[in-house]
């Protein structure tokens, strides 16, 4: 069952229909923009093109949600593919959004490495020739894995020691969320998301708008409103109601269902048991 509150409902353009009506010759820049728009709106095709992976419908729907929401939680049963779908999301996010910094964290380094290793397995397959060309240098240390891709990085770290406090990220992927202490999430992990991905561009726009306001050309209310693009993805199996996972789950559900809420951030919550998995 899928549920979407009215405040999240919006008119969705049929991009494929519009693109199918294009005729004639496209200039190089326009062709690139058109292709990227098509690939972004057809995640099944894009994933298959880059990696040879054929997504199940529930996996494609989940990927779309991860792209369109700031805070996402997948409470899935064992063997339902949480780490796999996170690995696919990581490389797609970096392909579509250059300079993205993704931080994968877990209660142990072994947990964090699992998603990173999934990405490696996908990239090293014979079908992932195109995807492999997007990746660059790879660094593996005892307490940190890092892989450069499209101007950004995918980094896996353990949640131990003071070292993690120095990291910054646009996307935070937390595996085994139920095992992470609440104070670590609030005081250590959430501050990772403070740096906008396009800080340089935002500063330039602010400087231009400061001058325009001084000249009286625009007013303070006319300033550009930047969309919040930071993301946190929580992956976990189900836990007891007295644990922080359930508390966070209820908090996000309430924010989704609250009709009066005017929060800038958007939320997505998904539950999946092994009985609901497709047979093939």
Model-derived features with residue positions:
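Phosphate/NTP-binding elements of NTP-utilizing enzymes
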Residues: 2-280
